[in-house]
């Protein structure tokens, strides 16, 4: 199987100390390598949208990142504001604490509120799989399928672990073939990206996109 890795990559920079210069460089790399999207914090959406105007590279914004523990109303507003600023995709973090507390209706309402404010803008829902049991992963994936979101996503890359092959396979098996699955966190080289794609990922979130498309190894500190 020949894989066009660039088509899978959300070229990502989410560090709290990321500078505007670094975001501009991220966008330049995305244009050069024809990545699917860049993924940035919502405060940098206007910069990314300006840099990528007139190109095929989409702007993705994270919401409620990285903890997912804020007010539902704040998440919904942030999504709406990011879209207004130029975001073409939204990646939100679920409230993991609510899930672990058994507050299933609240978790679902949290996702639905953001989805409703996204309207036609694709929504990806970050599970933070490293903190969840297999049963909880299935539970959230089924919830997302019911809510008709575009993607389920493994990780923020800011917790105790990133994407794992077995979690991607489980997510794909749960949501079926019509939803997207995004593997993110610790995908730093071509071999790992290939493993995730073969497991069922249709998008890869990584700060190592250039290394992946060039067949090199990124640093261990990369997202």
From Swiss-Prot:
Biological or metabolic pathway of the protein: Carbohydrate degradation; 2-deoxy-D-ribose 1-phosphate degradation; D-glyceraldehyde 3-phosphate and acetaldehyde from 2-deoxy-alpha-D-ribose 1-phosphate: step 2/2
Swiss-Prot/TrEMBL catalytic activity: 2-deoxy-D-ribose 5-phosphate = D-glyceraldehyde 3-phosphate + acetaldehyde
BP GO annotations: 2-deoxyribose 1-phosphate catabolic process; carbohydrate catabolic process; deoxyribonucleotide catabolic process
EC number assigned by the record: 4.1.2.4
InterPro entries hit by this protein: Aldolase_TIM, DeoC, DeoC/FbaB/LacD_aldolase, DeoC_typeI
Cross-referenced Pfam families: DeoC
Enzyme class: lyase
Alphabetical keyword list: Cytoplasm, Lyase, Schiff base
Active-site residues, record numbering mapped to chain: 91, 153, 182
GO cellular component: cytoplasm
Subcellular location: Cytoplasm
GO MF term list: deoxyribose-phosphate aldolase activity
Entry-linked HAMAP family: DeoC_type1 (MF_00114)
Protein family according to the UniProt entry: Belongs to the DeoC/FbaB aldolase family. DeoC type 1 subfamily.
Role summary: Catalyzes a reversible aldol reaction between acetaldehyde and D-glyceraldehyde 3-phosphate to generate 2-deoxy-D-ribose 5-phosphate.
Name of this chain's protein: Deoxyribose-phosphate aldolase
Organism: Yersinia enterocolitica serotype O:8 / biotype 1B (strain NCTC 13174 / 8081)
């Amino acid at each position: 199987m020949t894989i066009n890795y660039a088509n899978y990559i959300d070229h990502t920079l989410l560090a709290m100390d990321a500078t505007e210069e670094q975001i501009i460089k991220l966008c330049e790399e995305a244009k050069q390598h024809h990545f699917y999207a860049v993924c940035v914090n919502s405060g940098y959406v206007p910069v990314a949208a300006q840099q990528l105007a007139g190109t095929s590279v989409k702007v993705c914004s994270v919401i409620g990142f990285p903890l997912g523990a804020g007010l539902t109303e704040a998440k919904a507003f942030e999504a709406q504001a990011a879209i207004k600023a130029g975001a073409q995709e939204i990646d939100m973090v679920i409230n993991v604490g609510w899930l672990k507390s058994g507050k299933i209706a609240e978790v679902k309402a949290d996702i639905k509120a953001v989805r409703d404010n996204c309207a036609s803008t694709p929504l990806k829902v970050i599970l933070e799989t490293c903190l969840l049991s297999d049963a909880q992963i299935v539970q959230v994936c089924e919830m997302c399928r019911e809510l008709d979101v575009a993607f389920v996503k493994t990780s923020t890359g800011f917790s105790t672990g990133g994407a794992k092959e077995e979690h991607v396979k489980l997510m794909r098996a749960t949501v079926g073939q019509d939803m997207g699955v995004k593997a993110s966190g610790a995908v730093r080289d071509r071999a790992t990206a290939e493993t995730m794609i073969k497991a069922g990922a249709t998008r890869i979130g990584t700060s190592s996109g250039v290394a992946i498309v060039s067949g090199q190894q990124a640093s261990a500190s990369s997202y």
